[in-house]
């Protein structure tokens, strides 16, 4: 079965949301009305192509892409920042090469998309602390702290009324910067656990999920690249540490392409 058929066959009940991890830091959200929201899908070997001279096989893709660029219909595409495993420069044109999909991104991500051939009328520039209303949800853009390597990274809270789904973007555990997300108490949190390149590790993610009083946490940002090893993203750490640091939050481990329905 193709991933498109799999996705089309998922039926989401009213007051429910489907969350699909598509590998690395990428997710799809599918709504009751069959709208598809994509967040930071990484679908090619773009990072390896970009960095292989410096890192060798360190950023070689080690897991297959869940779907091909252009294979599925996406309504909204959100990019948290311009790093290649979040804004895929080799996939972005095909992702937007239709009459349906719009990209919401920061200025640097916009530049990458335009360089890839995307028309500006397919892109809307966004920044932290903005709020945008859509038919089925409200988008609340939250600050994140990715250090000096990226100062314009954003987090996203998708407020569907019955549930708030939080995608942190790449961030470290800086409670002052993350205060907005903590105050909004999203029920579902999608958090990185690689603990490198300015990101949360498993313990940080558990503490952060506990701060937000999240009911569900789906970890990501692991096992895509050879550099994701040991302290740089071992999911067993999350499995062991969430019961200790976030006892009221259920850890949901997904394999790439697997769906979880909340509600």
What function would you assign to each model-found segment?
Residues 34-78, 90-91, 171-183:
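Pre-active-site segment of Zn-dependent metallo-hydrolases
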Residues 1-47, 51-54, 237-248, 256-258:
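Zn-dependent metallo-beta-lactamase
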Residues 73-85, 217:
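Metallo-beta-lactamase
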Residues 12, 102, 117-133, 176, ...:
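Binuclear metal-ion centers of metallo-dependent hydrolases, dominated by the metallo-beta-lactamase
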Residues 145-212:
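Active-site-proximal loop/helix segments of hydrolase catalytic cores
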Residues 12-17, 30-37, 131-140, 159-164, ...:
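Beta-strand-turn-beta hairpins that frame and shape the catalytic cleft
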Residues 41-43, 82, 108, 144-145, ...:
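Active-site metal-binding loops of divalent metal-dependent hydrolases
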Residues 35-37, 75-76, 102, 137, ...:
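Structural motif
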